[in-house]
């Protein structure tokens, strides 16, 4: 079974598909023994059991009955994780290979249980809307929100906050008048203060919820008309904005009120706060930039030099909100609809720690916002939302392994079980994590430490079990269980054959991003270079001090170029990006699966020509030809680039002449392929149509390996375009790598 087939079945890809036998051997591998796991990955033939799972009785284990368990005919099963013997359920007595229960079937290495435990509350959606925006932007946002109401479950509980200079909490239960409670936008309120203000007697005390805070969250089917009317009648914040000033915007206060209101009403139940912001917070708490336009918003340079005077204070405020949200199992989604930065860099942990969406768009009028937001409410074949709520993620391991940590949109539950390693990678010190929200695309990097210190017999097995508890949109609690077995070996040849360079590249990319949040950018680049050199010194074939002897086996041959493109990517090279853009890009990479992550790291390039089939080509400047059309997919952008000759023919209108039908077809082919890429992509990519000499051609040139540059004229003319850059090409990068490896440098 190849790596992709295993991923299709279990949603798991390992960097090393066999593990080193001892801790000492593991330390020599450079790339950690880690896995990328997509808990809710769609699988058409997923085994589903409509009963509760059977757990190991060892209180320090509690792993779940699975196909790797040894079944004793006398009526017991032996747990492969801890070795404990457990009694089989009475109705499983006398089972055989011909009548195995579903969870013991060899095809049930991944299985989902629908438990008998009911969900007390439907999912909760809490809209938080910025009114400091122009009428066109606000109008487009209102229209999209009204459309989204038709996509929510009818029983979903809905709440609404609008804010500008003040924060308004809307009482949707008030039928006769539109009623709201006003909070100051420049004040941080405690739970008690919010409770005291909102629990004051209301106009209609006869209603059951009259004096309860739950009256601010009502079933959509009961308040849809009222809510639609409120949304349609929202207007721009009336607070005057003086010349030379920014609007007084209270995003931090609005999020503070929303977080505390949910904390007081629905602790431990699935809820999403959806923030729609059109600019930066200019009021404390959570201030991003001062109200005077003469004060510029912070840049990467300001942050690096510690010149961003509001940055650390804002991060501290939003991180405190994130901690409360995680404790309550609530999620935050942030949608930006403006050219300005809104403060995503400061607010990113609201989404990163809760599994929420971070979406950057130029305006709420754009398709990127509209379609991406509505795709968040995609449904499965039974009509249920493709989003989970209120989840936990447990990692069980046999005694040979320990959990080093996790990197992804999750938070630690701080449960230090006996399989937790002291060597932390990412979010460590635990084997249990909170997944406030997840989708079928959410992927988590899990890292393991080899605990074994002694040699083992050949073909010794280790076991890993991933257990994901979550609230399903249908109103049931479910448990997704994946159990994996890996061989432990001391032979380098077997380890080499088991290396998945794609998974390894994505795992190392996640480790690199995690380091980037703590360390200096130059130090991170030096670290990833050292790791690549060490890996090649361990697994490449070469003769010392002889460059031409350097060879990598097919299992490793693409890995250096993945690292090359990662070094050049917007994830690490932040010079041309704002802090908000960097936060957005990194958030998406920490969310997506291997295939999408690789597209982000090393974009794909397809060439189209007359009278020939489309073909993948090198992501290289030599691929630019006058008579070709190129389709670039960076995940965030889909770009169609017309070569010089093609662009001239298009301007001349040849495609409108029936005699040149094949040219018209050539122009249409990349558009059709681009449309197919756009169908399922989340968030929706930006579409760019450009040509040789066009202003937006820079998006293509910035991604290409510059093998033909202004100071390297070896391949000019018809052999490719000249790239105006001082960046090192892949060829030079590989040459330096070979020299360092064969010389024994680090």
Swiss-Prot record:
It holds the Pfam family Gelsolin. It is a peripheral membrane protein. GO terms for cellular component: COPII vesicle coat; endoplasmic reticulum exit site; endoplasmic reticulum membrane; Golgi membrane. The keyword Nucleotidyltransferase does not apply. Zn(2+) binds at residues 56, 61, 79, 82. It comes from the Eukaryota. InterPro entries: ADF-H/Gelsolin-like_dom_sf, Gelsolin-like_dom, Gelsolin-like_dom_sf, Sec23, Sec23/24_helical_dom, Sec23/24_helical_dom_sf, Sec23/24_trunk_dom, Sec23_24_beta_S. Keywords: Cytoplasm, Cytoplasmic vesicle, Endoplasmic reticulum, ER-Golgi transport, Golgi apparatus, Membrane, Metal-binding, Protein transport, Transport, Zinc. Its main location: cytoplasm. GO terms for biological process: COPII-coated vesicle cargo loading; intracellular protein transport; positive regulation of ER to Golgi vesicle-mediated transport; positive regulation of protein exit from endoplasmic reticulum; regulation of COPII vesicle coating; reticulophagy. The COPII coat is composed of at least 5 proteins: the SEC23/24 complex, the SEC13/31 complex, and the protein SAR1. Belongs to the SEC23/SEC24 family. SEC23 subfamily. Component of the coat protein complex II (COPII) which promotes the formation of transport vesicles from the endoplasmic reticulum (ER). The coat has two main functions, the physical deformation of the endoplasmic reticulum membrane into vesicles and the selection of cargo molecules. PANTHER family: PROTEIN TRANSPORT PROTEIN SEC23 (PTHR11141:SF0). This is Protein transport protein SEC23. The lineage of its organism: Eukaryota, Fungi, Dikarya, Ascomycota, Saccharomycotina. The gene is SEC23.
């Amino acid at each position: 079974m190849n790596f992709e087939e295993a991923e299709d079945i279990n949603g798991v890809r390992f960097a090393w598909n066999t593990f080193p036998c001892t801790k000492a051997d593991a330390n020599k591998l450079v790339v950690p023994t880690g896995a990328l796991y997509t808990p809710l990955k769609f699988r058409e033939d997923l085994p589903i059991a409509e009963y509760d799972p059977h757990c190991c009785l060892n209180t320090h284990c509690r792993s779940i009955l699975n196909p790797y368990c040894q079944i004793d005919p006398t009526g017991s099963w032996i747990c492969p994780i801890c070795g404990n013997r457990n009694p089989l359920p009475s109705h499983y007595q006398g089972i055989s290979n011909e009548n195995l229960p579903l969870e013991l079937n060899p095809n049930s290495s991944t299985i989902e249980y629908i438990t008998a435990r009911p969900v007390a509350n439907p999912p909760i959606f809490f809209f938080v809307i910025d009114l400091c925006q122009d009428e066109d932007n606000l109008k487009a946002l209102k229209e999209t929100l009204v459309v989204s109401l038709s996509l929510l479950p009818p029983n979903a509980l809905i709440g609404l906050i609008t804010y500008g200079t003040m924060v308004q909490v809307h009482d949707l239960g008030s039928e006769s008048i539109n009623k709201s409670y006003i909070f100051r936008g420049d004040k941080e309120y405690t739970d008690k203060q919010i409770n005291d203000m909102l629990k004051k007697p209301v106009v209609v005390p006869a209603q059951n919820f009259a004096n309860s805070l739950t009256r601010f969250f009502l079933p959509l089917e009961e308040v849809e008309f009222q809510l639609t009317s409120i949304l349609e009648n929202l207007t721009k914040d009336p607070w005057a904005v003086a010349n030379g000033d920014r609007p007084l915007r209270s995003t931090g206060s609005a999020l503070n009120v929303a977080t505390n209101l949910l904390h007081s009403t629905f602790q431990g139940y699935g809820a999403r706060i959806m923030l729609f912001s059109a600019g930066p917070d200019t009021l404390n708490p959570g201030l991003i930039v001062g109200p005077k336009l003469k004060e510029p918003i912070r840049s990467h340079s300001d942050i690096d030099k510690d010149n961003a005077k509001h940055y650390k204070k804002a991060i501290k405020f939003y991180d405190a909100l994130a901690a409360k949200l995680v404790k309550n199992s609530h999620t935050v989604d942030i949608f930006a609809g403006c050219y300005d930065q809104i403060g995503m860099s400061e607010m990113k942990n609201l989404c990163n720690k809760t599994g929420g969406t971070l979406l950057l768009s130029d305006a709420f009028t754009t398709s990127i916002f509209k379609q991406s937001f509505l795709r968040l409410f995609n449904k499965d074949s039974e009509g249920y939302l493709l989003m989970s709520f209120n989840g936990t993620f447990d990692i069980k391991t046999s005694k040979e392994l320990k959990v080093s940590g996790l990197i992804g949109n999750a938070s630690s539950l701080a449960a230090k079980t006996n399989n937790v390693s002291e060597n932390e990678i990412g979010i460590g010190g635990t084997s249990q994590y909170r997944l406030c929200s997840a989708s079928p695309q959410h992927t988590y990097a899990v890292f393991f430490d080899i605990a074994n210190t002694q040699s083992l017999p050949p073909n010794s097995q280790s076991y890993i079990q991933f257990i994901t508890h979550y609230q399903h949109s249908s109103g049931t609690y479910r448990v997704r269980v994946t159990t994996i077995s890996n061989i432990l070996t001391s032979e380098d040849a077997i380890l080499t054959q088991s290396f998945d360079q794609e998974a390894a590249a994505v795992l190392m990319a996640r480790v690199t991003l995690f380091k980037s949040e703590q360390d200096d950018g130059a130090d991170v680049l030096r670290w990833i270079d050292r790791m690549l050199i060490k890996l090649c010194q361990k697994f490449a074939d070469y003769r010392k001090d002889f460059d031409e002897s350097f060879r990598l086996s097919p299992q490793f041959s693409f890995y250096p170029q993945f690292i090359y493109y990662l070094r050049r990517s917007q994830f690490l090279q932040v010079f041309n990006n704002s802090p908000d853009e960097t936060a957005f890009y990194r958030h998406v990479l920490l969310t997506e699966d291997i295939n999408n992550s690789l597209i982000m790291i090393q974009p794909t390039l397809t060439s189209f020509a007359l009278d020939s089939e489309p073909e993948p080509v090198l992501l290289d400047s030599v691929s630019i030809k006058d008579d070709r059309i190129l389709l670039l997919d960076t995940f965030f952008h889909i770009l169609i680039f017309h070569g010089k000759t093609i662009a001239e023919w298009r301007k001349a209108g040849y495609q409108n002449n029936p005699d040149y039908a094949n040219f018209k077809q050539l122009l249409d082919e990349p558009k059709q392929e681009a449309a197919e890429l756009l169908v399922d992509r989340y968030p929706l990519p930006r579409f760019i149509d450009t040509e040789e000499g066009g202003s937006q051609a820079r998006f293509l040139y910035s991604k290409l390996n510059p093998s033909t540059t202004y100071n390297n004229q070896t391949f000019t003319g018809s052999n490719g375009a000249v790239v105006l850059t001082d960046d090192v090409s892949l060829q030079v990068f590989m040459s330096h790598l070979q020299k360092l490896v064969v010389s024994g440098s680090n």
